[in-house]
Amino acid sequence: MMKKIVAVCLFLGLSLYANAKDTIVVLDTNIGKIELKMYPKVAPLAVENFTTHVKNGYYNGLKFHRIIKGFMIQGGDPRGNGTGGESIWKKPFKDEFANNVVFDKPFLLAMANSGPKTNGSQFFITLAPTGWLNGKHTIFGEVVKGKDVVRKMENVSVSPGNNVPMFDQVIKKAYIKK
């Protein structure tokens, strides 16, 4: 009987451990891989939207269409110009904010938007603390590996005035790390 109890406890413990594992999304770009840890407890809608798009291949072949040195790199627009993209629900979704998750460091992953409750498919990665964005953009993850790739991308030449990279910065493939 004791062996059965130990076996059940061990099984339950392993199940809880498996469920506690972080979801990591990999953006395999033309200059290297960026690994992003998701924040599902902070922003469940944004994480569901992003990871579902990843699983469906939505981001494959899309460009980082806007790069502002010292601020952020932005992607996720199928039009490639900052005017397109939609959520998995085919309509914008609400913002998700947490008082303890703020733009206080570089390498945060957040939803790009055009105002309150306008989240779609576009996202950005910060390159510095950007406190003025608190309460305006949903943070739903962070870069955990490939920060050097993000910094390389930050330093590519861009067109003056519109911050479009002179050479395409492409997400060759986005996928969930196993």
What function would you assign to each model-found segment?
Residues 1-6, 109:
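Bacterial N-terminal signal peptides that target proteins for export
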Residues 5-14:
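Sec-dependent N-terminal signal peptides
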Residues 13-178:
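Cyclophilin-like peptidyl-prolyl cis-trans isomerases
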